């Protein structure tokens, strides 16, 4: 026969384990049938939307609400996403599909077009005599003078910094060294 304190500890431990297993599940309402064992075994992750590509890290981070991001030296890896989708989604024109049509932040994120990279094509810039905001380009002499002024200012600053460092150093007389 089991001693009385050991029996109470066993019952308390069994109750604790039973409560811990059901901690994350919502109780079934009396009018709804209880989910099957297979449905309970799979964890449904809350997600805002479904990304067209698993390589789009910004989309995956935005859409999947409870993933854990682990920083590794080479890349940022999402854990907890499950298996990648079985079908190819290259035909989708959008970045992702929202779970709810009433989520304006998701609609804005998924349906906006990525900003194209700025590509500079030689010869497609402004005319040589006008520089961007209507300012005339400086002549070669003016540009050379500006570079000389910058160089002189840098050397003057370096000299002042050396003097300041020398003044901060303590000077020791010979009698302190004896």
Swiss-Prot record:
It comes from the Eukaryota. Keywords: Cleavage on pair of basic residues, Disulfide bond, Secreted, Signal, Vasoactive, Vasoconstrictor. PROSITE patterns: ENDOTHELIN (PS00270). One of its GO terms (cellular component) is extracellular space. Coiled coil: none annotated. The keyword Secreted applies. Residues 27-46, 70-178 form a propeptide. Residues 96-111 are annotated as: Endothelin-like. Residues 1-26 form the signal peptide. Endothelins are endothelium-derived vasoconstrictor peptides. This is Endothelin-2. The lineage of its organism: Eukaryota, Metazoa, Chordata, Craniata, Vertebrata. The gene is EDN2.
């Amino acid at each position: 026969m089991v001693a009385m304190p050991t029996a109470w500890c066993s019952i308390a431990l069994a109750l604790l384990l039973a409560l811990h297993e059901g901690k994350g599940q919502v109780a079934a309402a009396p009018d709804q049938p209880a989910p099957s064992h297979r449905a309970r075994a799979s964890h449904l992750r809350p997600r805002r939307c479904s990304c067209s590509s698993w390589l789009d890290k910004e989309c995956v981070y935005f859409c999947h609400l409870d993933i854990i991001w682990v920083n590794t030296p080479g890349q940022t890896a999402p854990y907890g996403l499950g298996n990648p989708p079985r079908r190819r989604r290259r035909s989708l024109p959008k970045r992702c599909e929202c779970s709810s049509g009433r989520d304006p932040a998701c609609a804005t994120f998924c349906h906006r077009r990525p900003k194209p990279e700025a590509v500079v094509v030689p010869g497609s810039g402004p005319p040589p005599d006008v520089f961007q905001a209507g300012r005339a380009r400086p002549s070669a002499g003016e540009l050379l003078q500006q570079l000389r002024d910058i160089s002189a200012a840098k050397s003057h600053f370096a000299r002042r910094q050396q003097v300041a460092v020398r003044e901060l150093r303590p000077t020791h007389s010979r009698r302190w060294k004896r």
